[in-house]
C-alpha cells in the first residue's frame, strides 16, 4: 500500500509531466510546431503576407486522427477561409479556462462534450491545397493570445 505522501507526490508529478494539453495528433510523441517551408512558418506571430500568424501549426499527417487537447465542449464549426473547400473546416472548443479554434480537421461532431485525448476528428488533405507544405493542425486561442505554452 502507498503512503499518503507517495500518492500526493504522484498526483503532483503526473500533470506536470503531461502538460496542460494532450498530444493532438495520432502517431506523434509531442505537439511539435511546424517549421518554415515554402508556404510560411508555423510559430505564433510568424509573418504571413501582410499579417501575423495568430495561432500555431502543430505537425500532423494528412488523414491522421486528431485528438481533443483538453476536456470541454465543442461549441460549433469554424471555417478559416471563404474558399479552399478541401480544408475549410474546423471547430471551436471551450473548457477548463481555454477557448480555441482548430482548423483543417473533419470533426466527428460540431457540438457536445469532449474529453482530453478523445478522438476529435481527422486531418484534412492540406497537400491538395498547399503542395509541399508541412501538414498540420492550426490552433488559435479565441482571444488571439499565444497558445504555445499549452502545447
Curated annotation (Swiss-Prot):
Pfam families: Peptidase_M23 (PF01551)
Keywords, comma-separated and alphabetical: Chemotaxis, Disulfide bond, Metal-binding, Secreted, Signal, Zinc
GO biological process, one term: chemotaxis
Listed GO MF terms: identical protein binding; metal ion binding
This protein's GO CC annotations: extracellular region
Location relative to the cell: Secreted
Domain of life from the UniProt record: Eukaryota
Residue positions binding Zn(2+): 53, 57, 138
Gene3D superfamilies found in the cross-reference section: Glucose Permease (Domain IIA)
Signal peptide: 1-18
Cysteines joined through disulfide linkages: 25-60, 36-41, 99-142
InterPro entries referenced in this protein's UniProt entry, alphabetically: Dup_hybrid_motif (IPR011055), LECT2 (IPR008663), LECT2_chordata (IPR017381), Peptidase_M23 (IPR016047)
Family named by the database record: Belongs to the LECT2/MIM-1 family.
Function: Has a neutrophil chemotactic activity. Also a positive regulator of chondrocyte proliferation.
Name of this chain's protein: Leukocyte cell-derived chemotaxin-2
Gene: LECT2
